[in-house]
């Protein structure tokens, strides 16, 4: 059984559905969770659910100094889950430079800073687990998401590079790539749109945020000590790689 008692985990994007599920699961397994995001009210609501053994840290990931300080404020960090991300979808011929830059800055650059600062702390203890949340489209591509796909593909490459650099230091760096996961966004789709998507999924259903949380929990555990530089796809068979 996975036991994270005595460990501290930082989860970014914790105010969203997947981030909240990850925080709940790591908390359930005994970890002190530091829940971070830009929406303080949603973080407080999550904290009320957790009741204890949590800390709220509001952070604007577009500010590189705030990214660095977010990790610097933590005395001991065992687990980092980089889950925060944004989309600015449109066809490439209509995509503005700032739409591309904003997605790269938050989805890739901010996560690099968080990974780098976490590694500095983890190297001191010669132990750490880093899990970067990427996406199925970081491998498959998707029309109208050139910026988002580039950021998520970059996250996979970054994960592999960092895994090489710290493999002898007791630190693992892995990624989890969600497919279509039930969310507020998918709930707004009409029946025809939902059916079109589920037809592409061999399992025939959307995933749940808890499916991602379970994958993260395993990669955050000591049981995954011989796994690093990998991307765990959680997509119901929609993409088999």
Curated annotation (Swiss-Prot):
Pfam families: adh_short_C2. Keywords: Fatty acid biosynthesis, Fatty acid metabolism, Lipid biosynthesis, Lipid metabolism, NADP, Oxidoreductase. Belongs to the short-chain dehydrogenases/reductases (SDR) family. Pathway: Lipid metabolism; fatty acid biosynthesis. NADP(+) binds at residues 13-16, 38, 57-58, 83, 148-152, 181. Its EC number is 1.1.1.100. Catalyzes the NADPH-dependent reduction of beta-ketoacyl-ACP substrates to beta-hydroxyacyl-ACP products, the first reductive step in the elongation cycle of fatty acid biosynthesis. The keyword Plastid does not apply. The keyword tRNA-binding does not apply. SMART domains: PKS_KR (SM00822). This is 3-oxoacyl-[acyl-carrier-protein] reductase FabG. The active site is at residue 148. Substrate binds at residue 135.
């Amino acid at each position: 059984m996975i036991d994270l008692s005595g460990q501290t985990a930082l989860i970014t994007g914790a105010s969203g559905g997947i981030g909240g599920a990850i925080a709940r699961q790591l908390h359930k397994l005994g970890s002190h969770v530091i829940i971070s995001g830009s929406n303080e009210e949603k973080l407080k609501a999550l904290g009320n659910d957790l009741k204890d053994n949590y800390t709220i840290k509001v952070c604007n990931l577009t500010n590189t100094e705030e990214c660095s300080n977010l990790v610097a404020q933590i005395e001991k960090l065992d687990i980092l889950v980089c889950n925060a991300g944004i989309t600015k979808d449109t066809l490439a011929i209509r995509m503005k430079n700032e739409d591309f830059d904003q997605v790269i800055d938050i989805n890739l650059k901010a996560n690099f800073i968080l990974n780098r600062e976490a590694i500095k702390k983890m190297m001191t203890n010669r132990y750490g687990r880093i899990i970067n949340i990427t996406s199925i489209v970081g491998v498959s591509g998707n029309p109208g998401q050139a910026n988002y796909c580039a950021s998520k593909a970059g996250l996979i490459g970054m994960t592999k590079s960092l895994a090489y650099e710290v493999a002898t230091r007791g630190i693992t760096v892995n990624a989890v790539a969600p497919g279509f996961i039930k969310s507020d966004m998918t709930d707004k789709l009409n029946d025809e749109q939902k059916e079109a998507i589920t037809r592409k999924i061999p399992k025939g259903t959307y995933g749940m945020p808890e499916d991602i949380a379970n994958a993260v929990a395993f990669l955050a555990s000591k049981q995954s000590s011989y796994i690093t530089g990998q991307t765990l796809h959680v997509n119901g068979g929609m993409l088999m790689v």
